[in-house]
């Protein structure tokens, strides 16, 4: 498949396939054959790196056809999947694999690595993946138009809002299609979400950290791009909003696994174990071996409840914060706010939504206090920028209400060991 992709892709651009390319391909095949040996686990990671390149190559060379882009994406994901997603897991120490608990010490019969917990993240990653691939197809010139039901572009531009956003100077500043990079990140999220057992919080710490990095910081970057759309570009992108919402909702479902892995590494360090080695190979932990798997032989309603509510719930005060944040983002329409005041309302509203949704995770409840300075900012901005009387009253009320709502923690139904002191 690797040979067929490279030959097809190069001929698609009208280029001759050099001999060195075939040498590289056959060497890669040799590595793939070596990876079949259980003693040569590193060869599987070499194959995974080849798969990563196959994911990126259509973006790096601006794939001229949709078939070339689809071929690279599909084969790249399959190469990575068959290299490192299948069992036995690569690089996990025997101590981590055969001893130790399923639940982190001190946690109340709840493992953040169970499939019920990962399923919402993987589902949302698929949503973002398909949206990003669709946007990439337009950026690569594979389709002539893109769906946009709500937002128009500039008056002197026949493009709609989505088309204008993804062909703007911000997007074109990247050397490759930025939507394609998003699709690649979502693909990696899907695959890292599938790696490892229900004990991967201690058997594969580096995978958990990589998974968290792809979701939390990159999710914040995605939200930042949404924030700048009306401020710098003057319009919106419906599909970008949906993808950003999918990324944002992933954050509360992913942070508890990061907390469990951080606690595990801290305990191993206190025990005098080699931290760097354990980070890559995992280790055992306090507690007895528990050979437990996810129980899918339940009522669908019970499974759905476990998927949605595992370590995550929506306190009424944080739900109201999300609504107020959305209301602030719409003051251009509701109060006719313009200029710097409209930009300030939009920026603060988006940050309030991000903070409140993140705090849906019980392990992140302390983070809600960041809403207080955002509320204080709302009490200042009406006196800095021009605003109507109605807009002034609205902003001041929103600021006071946000400060009051952020004081309540909300219920927490699980225990998180030493992290409980931060769930308040």
Where are the model-predicted features located?
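A domain-level signal for the structural core that forms small-molecule/cofactor-binding pockets
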Residues: 381-383
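Membrane-interfacial helix-loop segments of redox and metal-homeostasis proteins
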Residues: 7-32, 39-47, 53, 59-348, ...
């Amino acid at each position: 498949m690797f040979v067929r992709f490279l030959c097809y892709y190069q001929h698609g651009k009208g280029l001759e396939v050099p001999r060195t390319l075939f040498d590289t391909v056959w060497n890669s095949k040799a590595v793939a054959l070596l990876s079949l040996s259980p003693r040569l686990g590193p060869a599987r990671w070499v194959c995974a790196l080849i798969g990563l390149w196959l994911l990126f190559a259509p973006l790096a060379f601006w794939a001229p056809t949709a078939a070339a882009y689809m071929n690279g994406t599909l084969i790249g994901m399959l190469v990575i999947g068959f290299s490192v997603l299948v069992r036995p897991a690569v690089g996990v120490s025997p101590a981590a694999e055969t001893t130790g608990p399923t639940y982190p010490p001190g946690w109340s019969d709840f493992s953040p690595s169970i499939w019920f917990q990962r399923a919402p993240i993987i589902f949302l990653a698929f949503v973002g993946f398909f949206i990003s691939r669709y946007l990439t197809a337009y950026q690569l010139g594979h389709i002539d138009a893109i769906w946009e039901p709500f937002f128009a572009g500039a008056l002197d531009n026949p493009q709609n809002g989505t088309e204008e956003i993804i062909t703007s100077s911000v997007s074109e500043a990247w050397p490759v299609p930025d939507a394609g990079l998003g699709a690649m990140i979502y693909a990696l999220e899907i695959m890292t979400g599938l790696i490892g057992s229900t004990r991967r919080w201690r058997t594969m710490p580096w995978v958990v950290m990589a998974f968290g990095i792809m979701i939390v910081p990159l999710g914040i970057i995605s939200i930042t791009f949404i924030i700048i759309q009306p401020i710098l570009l003057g319009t919106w992108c419906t599909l970008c909003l949906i993808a950003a919402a999918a990324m944002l909702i992933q954050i509360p479902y992913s942070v508890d696994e990061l907390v469990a892995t951080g606690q595990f590494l801290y305990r191993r360090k206190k025990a005098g174990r080699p931290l760097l080695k354990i980070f890559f190979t995992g280790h055992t932990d306090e507690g007895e071996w528990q050979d437990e798997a996810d129980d899918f032989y339940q009522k669908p309603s019970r499974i759905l409840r476990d998927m949605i509510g595992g370590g995550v719930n929506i306190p009424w005060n944080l739900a109201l914060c999300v609504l107020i944040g959305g209301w602030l983002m719409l003051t251009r329409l509701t109060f006719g706010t313009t200029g710097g005041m409209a930009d300030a309302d939009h920026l603060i509203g988006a940050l309030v939504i991000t903070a409140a949704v993140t705090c849906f995770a019980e392990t992140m409840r302390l983070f809600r206090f960041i809403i207080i300075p955002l509320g204080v900012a709302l009490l200042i901005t009406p006196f800095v920028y021009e605003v109507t009387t109605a807009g002034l009253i609205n902003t001041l009320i929103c600021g006071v209400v946000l400060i009051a709502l952020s004081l309540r923690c909300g219920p927490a139904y699980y225990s998180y060991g030493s992290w409980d002191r931060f769930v308040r």
